[in-house]
């Protein structure tokens, strides 16, 4: 009789526990579904701003538009630098250079932008001819910035390529160069800029040096290779110049906050 009395109680306890577990599972499923709905709602509510008036005006000067990937090797560099011919004014230069990425590659750009803006001011105020008449060896003869194509990342994100070209008075010491800079526009907002191409050099015989920067740009980021060569005028036993070479390999990732250096190292 005791066994018969306990059996109904055991069955009742088992059913109660089963119902409790089912309720917990349903609650968890409902909670998960609710979280997914909230996440989807937040994603749908992201508002992409319109392009600023300054950017709209600037983009009227673009030469072409390319999809990624884009190869900026020696051949691509030559074609690109020849195709970039629409001059940038001081306001546009300041807009594009306002957030240069803190990186080894942009040290040269920062310095050139300072000289570029000073030269633009001379030309605007009518003092450029007087400046040319006062040129001496080693002085900057001219420097200009020009608008290039855009590289399309997606509907609301792209890179603006622009060029700085400069040269000194034609005597030793002499220097000249072409810089290609990429400015990132992410979801219609201008973020920052970084150097992606360079061909430059200078000499004060027998000392000389040159630099080349080429890049491969795809939907994930930019891989840049910088090659520096220099000679201090020294020769080996056979009379050949002793040339020092250094190669730096960098990967620049782009995200909603702008360009970010992911890795950097010396290859040689």
Placement of each model-derived feature along the sequence:
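Positively charged n-region of N-terminal signal peptides that target proteins for export
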Residues: 1-5
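C-terminal motif of bacterial Sec signal peptides marking the signal peptidase cleavage site
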Residues: 15-16
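Terminal domain-start segments
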Residues: 26-148
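Surface-exposed loop/turn elements that mediate protein-protein interactions on large endomembrane-trafficking
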Residues: 118-138, 182-195, 253-261
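Short, surface-exposed coil-to-beta transition loops
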Residues: 143-146, 166-181, 195, 207-212, ...
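Structural signature of eukaryotic scaffold interfaces centered on beta-propeller domains
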Residues: 146-154, 213-218
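Short beta-strand elements that form the blades of beta-propeller/WD-repeat-like
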Residues: 157-170, 220-227
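Short aromatic loop motif centered on NTY/YTY
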Residues: 191-262, 267-268
